Every structure is written in C-alpha cells, then in structure tokens.
Amino acid sequence: MRTDMLRELERIVRLAGDMVREAHDIEQVTTEKTGAADLVTKYDVAVQGFLKRELLTLLPEADFFGEEGEHAALTRPWTFIVDPIDGTTNFVRRLHYSNISVALAHDGQVAYAVVYDPFADQLFSAQKDCGAFCNGLPIHVSDKDMAHAVFLCGSTIYDRSLTEQNFSLLRQLYDRGLDSRRF
C-alpha cells in the first residue's frame, strides 16, 4: 500500500524528470568533478536544486544529502538522499539510460525510495514494510532459479580499488547464471 508520502515523492520526482527529458545543450555544459568519468552538468545542479526546494517544502525538518556537493551534517531523524541524474555519462552522450534517485531515510534506515527513468517513463518506488512498485503496480523479486537468470550489473568506476572485488563477484554470478548484461 502506497502512502501519501510515497505518492508525494513520486509526484516531485516525476516533475524533476520533466526537466531532464527537456534538457538541451548538454555537451556544452559538462565539467568534471573528480575525473573524466565523474561528470556534472548544469542540469544535475538545476535538478538537485529543484528537488531540494520541493523535498524540504514537503518535510522541512529533514536534512538533505545531494550528490552534487550538498552534504548536510545528517543530525536530524529524517534525511533526503538524492542523485539528481544517476548516469550523467549516459545523459551527456544522449543515451537514455539515466534516472533520478531519491530516498528518504529515518534514523539511518531507508523508509521510502523513488527511482525514475524519465525517458522510458518508468517510476520505481518502495516503502519500508509495504512493498515495491513500478508505475504504481506491485512488483516482486523473481523466483527464477539462478541457473536460468540473466544478471544486470554495474561497476565501481569512481573507485578503481574495488575493481578486482567487483569482477570477482560478477564472475561468481556469471558462473551460476544464464548470462549477464552490463549497462
């Protein structure tokens, strides 16, 4: 069952998705944060600013922790955790594999989460102890046997010290599953 808080988070994140979908001049406004693989655009900053305003209007007593340099002290019971454009490298190259990620944690535990792909109009949301949803419909973990499963994985591009561990885990999944995909 989705509560009013989850519905409000979904609404706000969809509005942020409109900003991402309507972006232009992306290539001309890109800068590096910590290296060539860690990019930020004016849209990352604008979407994060929008989300901060809207989310703190929704829950003013919360802290805000944003990927683009907005790291609160995290001393309050409620904290918003935001990645305004998760997949900026794809976004800059106009590959439509980016999303907006927002979580609301209470006392260090995620209570609500919303991940929205504005290009596919897929909104995933979850509420602690209430299940997960895709575009409002309940979803669940697959019950397929691992031998018949296809795995999707990411990597640790920002911390190369974890590369060996990452690929070791991927190898274990690959050996036990049907196939793997990396996006």
Residue ranges and their predicted role:
Residues 1-85:
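N-terminal subdomain of lithium-sensitive/metallo-dependent phosphomonoesterases centered on the IMPase/IPPase/PAP
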Residues 74-133:
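DPxDG-like acidic metal-binding loop motif
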Residues 111, 139-141:
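Short, isolated positions in well-ordered beta-strands
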Residues 141-183:
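An extended, acidic
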